[in-house]
Regions:
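Bacterial N-terminal signal peptides
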Residues: 5-16
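Eukaryotic scaffold repeat domains enriched in small/polar residues
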Residues: 20-336
Length: 336
């Protein structure tokens, strides 16, 4: 198996992802340490290591119910499965992501009032040389099914734990705002009652709700910067009470809604976050910072840098944290 080594940053990265992040103060002692060189290097000629992994834009990481780690990137073999120790298991799943590029959204940007230098998508989607440009997010639901988001195809796919396609949401290559369409979706989360919560995302600036079997239940949110509005809803998680937490990336905040989509409150000045991780004990990783459900920072990962560097991530049952970076690496942190 051959994995490309070309790494080019996404043309449409938000301004905040280039170094802006919320100031942190009085964050307690760090309980994590970084793991170097994860996953393990491939073995090359003569049994020698072939060098560290260097993917084309790691967009997300997920942890399967069996404990194995799924790494999503935009190169060949877009989903790779590893054991927690870093050994490669092999490619995962039968999903083929979009190879195409999204056409410039000049008219949409002008109509929305978005600034082209934010997430205005004036450039192609994905890195130069990417072969699976649509690979955007990967999540594992409570039953162990694997869900992947293909933004340019406007499609979300549900797979079994073995990688077999079970169901899709959206209509492939057909963008829109109907009950059966997305417009560049970004993430999916799973509510305690079984509902599916989708951030729909780059084009629609809304959050859509579906039943467990994929029936459209409704949507909430409009484009803007007021309460309950979005300028790119990019990541989403749901707590044990069914409250929905959405990263409003271009507005650099997290908005919280009840299970029906009613706006409740927001956390401001958190930077241009792309992804969230809900922990089993009901805390949220916002990039490299762990917060309680009131938004208070509890601790930060060592050397994690700006929270906005992480495009996606996951937490293992033993507390290990994995972050996927568009620079083409996976960062792993273990509890001390």
């Amino acid at each position: 198996m051959r994995v490309s080594y070309l790494v080019v940053l996404l043309c449409a990265l938000p301004v905040a992802a280039l170094g802006q992040s919320a100031p942190k103060s009085d964050i307690p002692v760090i309980h994590y340490k970084a793991v170097g060189a994860w996953p393990k290097p491939l073995i090359g000629d003569k049994g020698l290591p072939a060098g560290p992994w260097n993917y084309i834009q790691v967009t997300s990481v997920a942890v399967k119910k069996d404990g194995n780690i799924l790494v999503m990137h935009r190169g060949d073999d877009p989903i790779l499965e590893y054991r927690p120790n870093g050994d490669l298991v092999g490619p995962f799943g039968d999903v083929k992501f979009s190879h195409g590029k999204v056409m410039p959204m000049q008219k949409d940007v002008a109509a929305s009032g978005r600034k082209p230098d934010m997430s205005g998508y004036q450039a192609v989607y994905g890195a130069a040389g990417c072969s699976n440009c649509g690979a955007h997010e990967i999540r594992v639901d409570p039953e162990g099914n694997v869900w992947v988001v293909d933004a340019p195809s406007h499609l979300i796919t549900k797979m079994s734990a073995s990688g077999r396609t079970l169901m899709t949401l959206g209509t492939r290559d057909k963008r829109g705002k109907s009950a059966t369409q997305f417009y560049l979706p970004t993430d999916i989360a799973f509510a305690p009652n079984g509902e599916l919560i989708v951030t729909d995302g780059y084009g629609n600036d809304r959050v859509a709700r579906f039943s467990k079997d994929g029936k459209f239940l409704g949507a909430f949110g409009t484009r803007g910067n007021g309460p309950g509005q979005f300028q790119l809803p990019h990541g989403v998680v749901v707590d044990a009470k069914g409250q929905i937490y959405v990263t409003d990336r271009d507005n650099q905040r997290i908005e919280i809604f009840d299970s029906s989509g009613k706006y409740l409150r927001q956390w401001e000045h958190v930077g241009g976050l792309s992804s969230l991780i809900m922990t089993p004990d009901q805390h949220i990783w916002t990039g490299a910072t762990l917060r309680d459900l009131n938004g208070k920072p509890i601790e930060t990962l060592p050397g994690g840098g700006a929270d906005s560097r992480a495009h996606g991530g996951a937490m293992a049952p033993n507390g290990d944290v994995y972050l996927g970076l568009l620079s083409g690496v996976v960062e792993k942190y273990v509890r001390q």
